[in-house]
């Protein structure tokens, strides 16, 4: 699954004020804090707590919020909050929580759970953030499938320092604040609160001489070309997951995923409804009246429809199997052709004369030539009885 929209996570609109964002976060944090949720639902509550914390950290910072509003998750700079800032890591623990609430949870919960998942060396390990990419394709491409290339901006491991963040020939040192633990304990009265170390941001290490290529981040922004296989029958809004092509993890953590979300261009002829297609077919007045064969378009060529004599405007003809075979469908949908009877325009004098003669002959025949008009006239008469 991709990362949820930060505004959706907090339950606020995109125009929410700082106070509204903070209030929404406090409410969610109180509800889902791990110390308040034990038993079967503990893990789900913990994930929601982390998700709300991440959303708040992003939207409470004006610069990060502006970048997120413009580019979404893909545009968030992982170094905006210093070398240890990792948006979307999902395992950052609860550090910073006490900073947002002051003494509230120190009084309520006591010791606070801390730290993210740790690797073999004791360092906190973070999964890279998921990225999203909107890809626009034609209806034909959606129906038949295609292979395409996309170029995306992404963060990759720095070639100079190989992801360490340290200048070549040097190395990171244990953090003197947390002594390499990545977390610190704060005393508040009778309570002890564990939170992410504010000095090393949970890494347990400090880089005395940062790499000049990545400024100590361990990763740099690059353009990456990826092959995307679009399956036949894909629909608007469906996503294709490219595993491991999101942002790289930190401290040996796994990379996130890239989700390619499909947008289908508006077609000049067809409208799609699930696996079915709809189109409007213009028909001359004379053909509708006299009947005859007409040619209609399909995604695989053209087909022929035999119009019966007296075809009315709005009549729908169904061509079975001429729609789209969806990804999870066993059979293709149908094509619905909606007749649009066209009234002739720009008539010559001779044509006008012929139509007037035809009109007079219709009037002499009464309502038998216009069944719809007859029923409408009867309804009007009934209305005024």
Swiss-Prot record:
Keyword Membrane set for record: no
The entry's keywords: Chaperone, Cytoplasm, DNA replication, Metal-binding, Repeat, Stress response, Zinc, Zinc-finger
Binding site for Zn(2+) 2: 175, 178, 197, 200
One Pfam family of this chain: DnaJ_CXXCXGXG
Localization: Cytoplasm
GO biological process: chaperone cofactor-dependent protein refolding; DNA replication; protein refolding; response to heat
Positions bound to Zn(2+) 1: 158, 161, 211, 214
NCBIfam families cross-referenced by the UniProt entry: DnaJ_bact, PRK10767.1
Complex and partners: Homodimer.
Domain comment quoted from the record: The J domain is necessary and sufficient to stimulate DnaK ATPase activity. Zinc center 1 plays an important role in the autonomous, DnaK-independent chaperone activity of DnaJ. Zinc center 2 is essential for interaction with DnaK and for DnaJ activity.
Known function: Participates actively in the response to hyperosmotic and heat shock by preventing the aggregation of stress-denatured proteins and by disaggregating proteins, also in an autonomous, DnaK-independent fashion. Unfolded proteins bind initially to DnaJ; upon interaction with the DnaJ-bound protein, DnaK hydrolyzes its bound ATP, resulting in the formation of a stable complex. GrpE releases ADP from DnaK; ATP binding to DnaK triggers the release of the substrate protein, thus completing the reaction cycle.
Name the UniProt record assigns to this protein: Chaperone protein DnaJ
Gene that encodes it: dnaJ
């Amino acid at each position: 699954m991709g990362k949820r929209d930060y505004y959706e996570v907090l339950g606020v609109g995109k125009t929410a004020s700082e106070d509204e964002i903070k209030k929404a976060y406090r409410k969610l944090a109180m509800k889902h804090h791990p110390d308040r949720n034990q038993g079967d639902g503990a893990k789900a509550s913990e994930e929601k707590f982390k998700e709300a914390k991440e959303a708040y950290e992003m939207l409470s910072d004006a610069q990060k919020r502006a970048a997120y509003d413009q580019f979404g998750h893909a545009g968030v700079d992982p170094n905006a909050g210093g070398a240890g800032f990792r948006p979307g890591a999902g395992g950052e623990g609860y550090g910073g929580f006490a900073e947002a609430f002051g003494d509230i949870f120190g009084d309520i919960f006591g010791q606070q759970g801390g730290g993210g998942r740790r690797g073999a060396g004791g360092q906190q390990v973070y999964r890279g953030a998921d990225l999203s990419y909107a890809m626009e394709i034609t209806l034909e491409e959606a129906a038949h499938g295609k292979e395409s290339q996309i170029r995306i901006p992404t963060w990759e491991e720095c070639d100079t320092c190989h992801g360490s963040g340290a200048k070549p020939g040097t190395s990171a040192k244990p953090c003197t604040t947390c002594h390499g633990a990545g977390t610190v304990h704060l005393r508040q009265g009778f309570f002890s609160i564990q939170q992410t170390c504010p000095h090393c941001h949970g890494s347990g290490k400090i880089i005395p001489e940062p790499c000049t290529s990545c400024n100590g981040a361990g990763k740099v922004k690059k353009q990456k070309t990826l092959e995307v296989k679009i399956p036949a029958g894909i629909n608007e809004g469906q996503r294709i997951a490219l595993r491991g092509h999101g942002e790289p993890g930190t401290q040996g953590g796994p990379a996130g995923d890239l989700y390619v979300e499909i947008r289908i261009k508006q077609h000049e002829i067809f409208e799609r409804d699930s696996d079915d297609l709809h189109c409007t077919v213009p028909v001359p007045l004379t053909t509708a009246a006299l009947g005859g064969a007409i040619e209609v378009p399909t995604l695989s060529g053209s087909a022929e429809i035999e119009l019966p004599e007296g075809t009315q405007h709005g009549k729908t003809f169904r061509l079975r199997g001429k729609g789209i075979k969806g990804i999870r469908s066993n059979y293709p949908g149908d094509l619905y052709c909606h007749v649009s009877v066209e009234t002739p325009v720009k008539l010559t004098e001779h044509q006008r004369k012929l139509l007037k003669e035809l009109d007079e002959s219709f009037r002499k025949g009464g309502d038998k030539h216009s069944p719809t008009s007859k029923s409408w006239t009867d309804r009007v008469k009934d209305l005024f009885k």
